[in-house]
């Protein structure tokens, strides 16, 4: 751990001290073993002083959090020295620094955030087509929220309830139609036998109806 002093202008008359801390970064989710050697020791860090910083190395993005190590992490650097006149090289390890803080980073896939979309936590699902071993951008990331889970589970009982209500309504309507038909039959039966009207009366009745204005 090293401390560096950053002096302000003489007008302020105050000194501001910035504390520096060495952190061991562990990257997980890398497929290529030569990934770090190809990135030329360049990276971008976002939110390094937050609980969950984000690290970008080449085209890969990592997210993680700080942890305390079980022991002390000692870091050495390699120095290559010529051991003999035959040209055999000998690698010598030289102490560089040590730390007890670790930053565990995991490979993360980012999705575009739409305007007006709220930041709601959820489960990230990665869907890959069968027998598709192409590069990672073919993965589709979507978030499934707890409310959506409850809606999916509750949809089946709702459908069964709707079907039951429709059956009850149909039964009620059929019962009403039967009840309405029964009194009609009773009235016809109670009205007594039909009286045959002679043909002459039928004609007179017909003529009278024709003469009405």
UniProtKB/Swiss-Prot annotation:
Biased composition (Basic and acidic residues): 1-11
Compartments where located: Nucleus
GO molecular function ontology, one term from the record: DNA binding
One GO cellular component term noted in the UniProt record for this chain: transcription factor TFIIIC complex
Modification N-acetylalanine occurs at: 2
Region (Disordered): 1-20, 191-213
UniProt main location, coarse: nucleus
Keywords: Acetylation, DNA-binding, Nucleus, Phosphoprotein, Transcription
GO BP of this protein: 5S class rRNA transcription by RNA polymerase III; transcription by RNA polymerase III; tRNA transcription by RNA polymerase III
InterPro entries according to UniProt: GTF3C6-like, TFIIIC_triple_barrel
Subunit: Part of the TFIIIC subcomplex TFIIIC2, consisting of six subunits, GTF3C1, GTF3C2, GTF3C3, GTF3C4, GTF3C5 and GTF3C6. Interacts with GTF3C4 and GTF3C5.
PANTHER family: GENERAL TRANSCRIPTION FACTOR 3C POLYPEPTIDE 6, TRANSCRIPTION INITIATION FACTOR IIIC TFIIIC , POLYPEPTIDE 6-RELATED
Record-stated family: Belongs to the TFIIIC subunit 6 family.
Protein name: General transcription factor 3C polypeptide 6
Source organism of this protein record: Homo sapiens (Human)
